[in-house]
């Protein structure tokens, strides 16, 4: 995690958290994640290369709105693996699991408008663009930014 994406400011520039300064930052967050697995509603996965099992990213449910049977997903992948279809394949698999095993009705994702590549992943996965949330996001610098929101319904993929 540290070597493949967390320490690289370029890799996390469209995320809400800063690049890890050293391996101890990564250990701290990994321990927090492990602790969250005690919660039955924790959905967090590593993204690995099929041939080597090298960890190159993560994808997880960052918010659950139970009354609406909705969840929101967040993801990150090493820039070394951008534009190779890996995130699209990963997102499709996670959406399938969340719809068919967990039972969500709606899945949504957001991205900073400065990062249209993330939106292209969402569209490739069948998500619908819903609009811009003005100054909804906060960059890892603390600056507010506009975010685009996409969603997909379970009925969209039947």
Residue ranges and their predicted role:
Residues 1-27, 31, 155-158:
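A short, well-structured alpha-helix characteristic of acyl/acetyltransferase catalytic modules
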Residues 5-8, 44, 48-158:
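Acyl-donor (CoA/ACP) binding surface of acyl/acetyltransferases
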Residues 18-22, 43, 114:
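Short, conserved alpha-helical segments within structured domains
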Residues 21-24, 33-35, 49, 76-78:
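Juxtamembrane/interface motifs at transmembrane-helix termini
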Residues 31-33, 136-137:
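A generic local structural motif
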Residues 32-46:
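A short helix-loop-beta-strand connector motif used in the catalytic cores of GNAT acetyltransferases and
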């Amino acid at each position: 995690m540290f070597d493949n994406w967390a320490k690289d400011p370029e890799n996390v520039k469209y995320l809400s958290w800063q690049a890890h300064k050293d391996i101890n930052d990564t250990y701290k967050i990994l321990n927090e994640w492990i602790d969250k697995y005690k919660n039955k509603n924790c959905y967090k996965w590593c993204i690995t290369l099929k041939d080597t099992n090298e960890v190159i990213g993560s994808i997880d449910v960052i918010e659950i709105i139970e009354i609406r049977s909705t969840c929101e997903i967040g993801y990150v992948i090493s820039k070394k693996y951008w534009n190779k279809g890996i995130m699209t394949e990963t997102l499709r698999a996670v959406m399938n699991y969340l719809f068919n095993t967990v039972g969500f009705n709606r899945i949504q994702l957001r991205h900073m408008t400065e990062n249209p590549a993330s939106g292209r992943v969402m569209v490739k996965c069948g998500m619908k663009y819903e609009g811009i949330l003005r100054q909804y996001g906060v960059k890892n610098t603390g600056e507010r930014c506009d975010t685009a929101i996409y969603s997909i319904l379970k009925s969209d993929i039947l």
